[in-house]
Amino acid sequence: MTKLTEEQLAALAALDTPTVCNALEIVAPERRGYGYTTKPMVCARPSLAPVVGYARTARIRAKTPPQRDATVMKQQRLDYYQYIDEGPKPSITVIEDLDEPAGFGAFWGEVQSNIHKGLGCLGVVTSGSVRDIPDCAEGFQMIAGSFGPSHAWVHLVDFDTEVSVHGMDVAPMDIVHADQHGAVVIPPAVAKDCLLYTSPSPRD
């Protein structure tokens, strides 16, 4: 895995996500047509600075109760937290909601934002919903498919797998950059080169 230095991560975090997309069009022109979110999303905290980190991935459902034993589900949740904790830092959690339509129940709110922040995660990008916005962990960014009031029967399906969130395909350990506009995957091979092409450019 190609890891960036703290200075390079900080430099990328100083850019908004559209600027990163502009740079990718130069250093990896084939990615003009993929690798970023393409559907509208909601941002819980638009005033926060962009986040950039290594992807930790999972998939969820919420419309129906889980079919597995409660003991098994509890152990899976503990294994998932260990997975988040053991990954490279900083991290961004990317969660695909498998329900149709997505967002029936929120995995993310006051509890999960605080747990994940404590495990070194800067924020989440999800096709699902988020809730408890005023009470979520300070400085933790949440970019989601929708806001919602209930968690319904939300549960993990699996984790550490490839996911798709609003048109953006993400593999574990991918470098993800996100802000109020959405998110983009930065290929490790060109991540450093992106910083060479971040001067102001046309937005159209």
What do the predicted segments below correspond to?
Residues 126-127, 132-178:
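A contiguous pocket-lining binding segment that forms or flanks enzyme active sites
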Residues 31-33, 54-57, 91-94, 121-125, ...:
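Structural motif
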Residues 182-196:
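A short alpha/beta connector and helix-capping loop motif
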Residues 82-127:
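Extracellular/luminal Protease-associated
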Residues 5-79:
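N-terminal low-complexity or amphipathic/hydrophobic leaders
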Residues 25-33, 63, 122, 181, ...:
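Generic secondary-structure signature for well-ordered alpha-helical cores
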Residues 197-204:
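Conserved small/polar residues in nucleotide/adenosyl-binding loops
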